[in-house]
From Swiss-Prot:
GO terms for biological process: negative regulation of DNA-templated transcription. SUPFAM superfamilies: GAF domain-like (SSF55781), Winged helix' DNA-binding domain (SSF46785). NCBIfam families: hrcA. One of its GO terms (molecular function) is DNA binding. Belongs to the HrcA family. Negative regulator of class I heat shock genes (grpE-dnaK-dnaJ and groELS operons). Prevents heat-shock induction of these operons. Pfam families: HrcA. The keyword Protease does not apply. It comes from Staphylococcus aureus (strain NCTC 8325 / PS 47). Keywords: Repressor, Stress response, Transcription, Transcription regulation. This is Heat-inducible transcription repressor HrcA. It comes from the Bacteria. PANTHER family: HEAT-INDUCIBLE TRANSCRIPTION REPRESSOR HRCA.
Amino acid sequence: MITDRQLSILNAIVEDYVDFGQPVGSKTLIERHNLNVSPATIRNEMKQLEDLNYIEKTHSSSGRSPSQLGFRYYVNRLLEQTSHQKTNKLRRLNQLLVENQYDVSSALTYFADELSNISQYTTLVVHPNHKQDIINNVHLIRANPNLVIMVIVFSSGHVEHVHLASDIPFNNDKLNTISNFVTNKLTEFNQNLQDDIVSFVQSEQEEIFINKLLNTMNNHISNQSNSIYMGGKVKLIDALNESNVSSIQPILQYIESNRIAELLQDISSPNINVKIGNEIDDSLSDISIVTSQYHFDETLKGQIAVIGPTAMHYQNVIQLLNRIW
């Protein structure tokens, strides 16, 4: 345990280091934070914090910077404080869903970009898993001679648009008939479905088209459940360029691999979680990931992540994720 005064000093060091990117000295602390104690007392308390591994000294400066343990202690206190706060939700994600005519993919793309612009960090938003949702309707629209747009409407009200390449010249009436057949058979994905298709179709072309439609729909829903929308990728590169150029490549490889997807999909708690440096991966000592869960309703849920340097404005990001969706 650390004393209240040591906690105040640690908080001040973390916040100054995040704001200015420079190690913090005792004189600077007194000037910026109006600490009503002598420089000698501050230096003594900083020595205690250093012995506890909460702050560390760099060779090029007389100041101190937070260690990973120091950031961890600071963040834990923040999370403890915010867990007791009631916040008014902005419901921005639901607004975007309406604005994009309930197209989930479009809404999440805009949401990732907005989060990045507000937080000034790179953001990831994971598409919700539709396994708990039910397909209510399938509509087919002829876009051009070689393209049919399949509109999938879920029981939650959300919509997915799927492009289906087809040069079979079905008119709109035939497409409506096929749409109604597929919609009626959605609850019968079993061994009898193929027999029903054979009985329903009037040509081999129709049978080929319906089987292609069903396969495309299943593949799309499966793939979308693993989709990740990224906003502000360049922001992470810019932030790391300022501190450690050599760390950029492994971080980008991690984000673009299945490992980040696995990390985010393991989030089952609605609470905000923060992983710092090596807590994420041994090769990622320079970044932090703040994660949370969002939901459109009780069944349709996904994950949000904000990624930045370990010297992140944690308080701003935590408050944002508490309110935005």
